[in-house]
């Protein structure tokens, strides 16, 4: 009844079976497009891992080890994570806002539980400005960004990554 709006983690054995199915099924017959995320998915490190640089690196190694053309969504090369917004007013995604209204209004889930779901599953997690540096607005703009910044832009950004030989 809640669809994607759950805090349940993904089944990695099922993911392994799916990846194996596509790799063996297309081998020698076709070429796959490979990606973990896009503007309609939560951040890859948060969705599939635990927000750590190690998880982001594991995802990159897995993606780049598969047969096909890898696509890396903006910020994933830095290990950008979900924003974990604390207030509904920080979200812009109509799907997220409608789901909050409908599911809490129907009494299927509490407002606090739905905020947890949004923090994990909302598309807005991948729509925050790219974190170029730790300056105001993460170096993304001198104007006012449409989406709030991910609060971790001081720690996760392109400038930091370039200076760290062990970065994602």
Regions found by a protein language model. Name each.
Residues 1-168:
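Active-site and adjacent substrate-binding regions of carbohydrate-active enzymes
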């Amino acid at each position: 009844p809640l669809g994607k709006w759950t805090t349940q983690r993904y089944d990695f054995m099922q993911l392994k079976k799916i990846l194996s199915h596509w790799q063996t099924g297309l081998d020698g017959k076709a070429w796959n497009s490979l990606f973990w995320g896009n503007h309609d998915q939560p951040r890859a490190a948060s969705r599939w891992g635990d927000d750590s640089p190690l998880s982001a690196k594991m995802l990159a190694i897995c993606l780049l080890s598969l047969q096909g053309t890898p696509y890396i969504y903006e910020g994933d090369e830095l290990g950008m994570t979900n924003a974990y917004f604390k207030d509904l007013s920080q979200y812009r995604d109509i799907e997220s806002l409608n789901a909050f209204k409908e599911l809490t209004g129907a009494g299927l889930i509490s407002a606090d539980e739905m905020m947890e779901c949004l923090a994990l599953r909302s598309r807005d997690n991948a729509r925050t400005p790219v974190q170029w540096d730790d300056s105001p607005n993460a170096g993304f703009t001198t104007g006012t960004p449409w989406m709030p910044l991910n609060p971790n832009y001081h720690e996760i950004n392109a400038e930091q990554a370039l200076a760290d030989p062990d970065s994602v």
